[in-house]
């Protein structure tokens, strides 16, 4: 979360409960904000993004598991909509 | 999915099974592609996006439910990463 202005959205679909919790912990530890049970958003440098993806790739994902990392520019983030009042954590968006 | 070049990612966190399934059906019917159990992506005009959000707002979401709609420009979509081999449906990304 230091420097850089690359915002990334990380969304995952992981079947195993303990692995799913582990991935959530990894993302929290990397300074991302939780916006949904399985979605985090954060700001990081390209190098930090690479490191994060390397850590995520090392996890023992099942055959139907998937993690998607989307960079989102500020312009797009401004056009984000939230429907429903569910709230996780703090911070953007 | 006709015209326009606004790509949107829709990610949701809905507790009730039947409502979650209903939202998935709505998004499929609107022509979006499923990329995860609770994430769809599609291309639509601004008007189609407004209509979609209006339909989603009419659903009886619970207090902790939340649907996030992120426009994603082509430049950002190109920098998208997928980790894991889980695959839903067809189409981008």
Curated annotation (Swiss-Prot), chains A, B:
List the GO biological process terms.
defense response to virus; maintenance of CRISPR repeat elements
Q: Which residues bind Mg(2+)?
A: 13
* InterPro entries reported in the protein's UniProt record: CRISPR_associated_Cas2, Virulence_VapD/CRISPR_Cas2
Q: Which Pfam families match?
A: CRISPR_Cas2 (PF09827)
**Matches recorded under Gene3D superfamilies:** 3.30.70.240
Q: Which GO terms describe its molecular function?
A: metal ion binding; RNA endonuclease activity
Please describe what this protein does. Answer: CRISPR (clustered regularly interspaced short palindromic repeat), is an adaptive immune system that provides protection against mobile genetic elements (viruses, transposable elements and conjugative plasmids). CRISPR clusters contain sequences complementary to antecedent mobile elements and target invading nucleic acids. CRISPR clusters are transcribed and processed into CRISPR RNA (crRNA). Functions as a ssRNA-specific endoribonuclease. Involved in the integration of spacer DNA into the CRISPR cassette.
Describe the protein's quaternary organization and the partners it interacts with.
Homodimer, forms a heterotetramer with a Cas1 homodimer.
UniProt-recorded name of the protein? CRISPR-associated endoribonuclease Cas2
Q: Which organism is it from?
A: Korarchaeum cryptofilum (strain OPF8)
């Amino acid at each position: 979360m230091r420097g850089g202005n690359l915002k990334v959205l990380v969304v995952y679909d992981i079947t195993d409960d303990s692995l799913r919790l582990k991935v959530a912990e990894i993302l929290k530890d990397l300074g991302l904000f939780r916006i949904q049970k399985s979605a985090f958003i954060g700001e990081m440098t390209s190098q930090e993004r690479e490191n994060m993806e390397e850590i995520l790739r090392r996890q023992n994902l099942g055959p139907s598991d998937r993690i998607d990392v989307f960079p989102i520019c500020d312009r797009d983030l401004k056009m984000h909509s939230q429907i429903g009042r569910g709230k996780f954590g703090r911070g953007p968006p």
